[in-house]
């Protein structure tokens, strides 16, 4: 399959396709969001704008196969922080199907469910350039690419390659991670400006990551 690149025409093509078919174009950004931070929000918002998507859904994982369960706080806190982070933010919403399903969160199972529930939606699954390299190892990847269009986020001039169809979006590198924020808090440092203030206030109020 050919590699797809984001060109000046990509957004126009997506918008024309949407007008012709009346199908919704929805992005999905999955993650542990432990906690959500500003880099997550920038990626979601910029992909939505650059591709002309109707909306991007932030989808918290229940038990991701690649994350240490010991480092993950209760889902009620992760969900509440997501809610606080996107208050009054246009074009972003939350999808909770993986939390509701429980168990290990395989993307194939999730997208099969969502495409069956929303047959009038074209889904765009957003991943980082580093994750594109691992697509061959994803659970049922050859079936997954028939359900969803992958969107790879890479920093400008960074070139990643894959045999799977990927739309590339260039974004400046924002070097923020959830583990960095957790480490700051454990060491008694305030992670100011790394995440929304409402989220930081909630973390402080609930005594998380101490």
From Swiss-Prot:
Pfam families cross-referenced by the UniProt entry: CTP_transf_like
UniProt record, GO biological process: NAD biosynthetic process
InterPro entries: Cyt_trans-like, NadD/NMNAT, Rossmann-like_a/b/a_fold
Enzyme Commission number, as recorded: 2.7.7.18
One Gene Ontology MF term: nicotinate-nucleotide adenylyltransferase activity
Entry superkingdom: Bacteria
HAMAP family named in the record: NaMN_adenylyltr
PANTHER family in UniProt: NICOTINATE-NUCLEOTIDE ADENYLYLTRANSFERASE-RELATED (PTHR39321), PHOSPHOPANTETHEINE ADENYLYLTRANSFERASE (PTHR39321:SF3)
Family membership: Belongs to the NadD family.
Function: Catalyzes the reversible adenylation of nicotinate mononucleotide (NaMN) to nicotinic acid adenine dinucleotide (NaAD).
Protein name according to UniProt: Probable nicotinate-nucleotide adenylyltransferase
Protein's organism: Streptococcus pyogenes serotype M1
């Amino acid at each position: 399959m050919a590699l797809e690149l984001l060109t000046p025409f990509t957004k126009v093509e997506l918008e024309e396709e949407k007008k012709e078919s009346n199908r919704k174009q929805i992005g999905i950004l999955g993650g542990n969001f432990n906690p959500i931070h500003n880099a997550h929000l920038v990626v979601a918002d910029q992909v939505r704008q650059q591709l002309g998507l109707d909306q991007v859904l932030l989808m918290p994982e229940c038990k991701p196969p690649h994350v240490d369960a010991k480092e993950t706080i209760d889902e009620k806190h992760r969900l509440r922080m997501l809610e606080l982070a996107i208050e009054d933010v246009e074009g972003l919403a939350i999808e909770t199907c993986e939390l509701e399903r429980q168990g290990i969160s395989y993307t194939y199972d999730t997208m099969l469910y969502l495409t069956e529930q929303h047959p009038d939606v074209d889904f765009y699954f957003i991943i980082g350039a580093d994750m594109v390299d691992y697509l061959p190892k994803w659970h049922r990847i050859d079936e997954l690419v028939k359900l969803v269009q992958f969107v790879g986020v890479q920093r400008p001039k960074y070139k990643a390659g894959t045999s799977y169809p990927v739309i590339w979006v260039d974004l400046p590198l924002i070097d923020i991670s959830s583990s960095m924020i957790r480490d700051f808090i454990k060491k008694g440092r305030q992670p100011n400006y790394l995440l929304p203030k409402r989220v930081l206030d909630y973390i402080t109020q609930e005594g998380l990551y101490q």
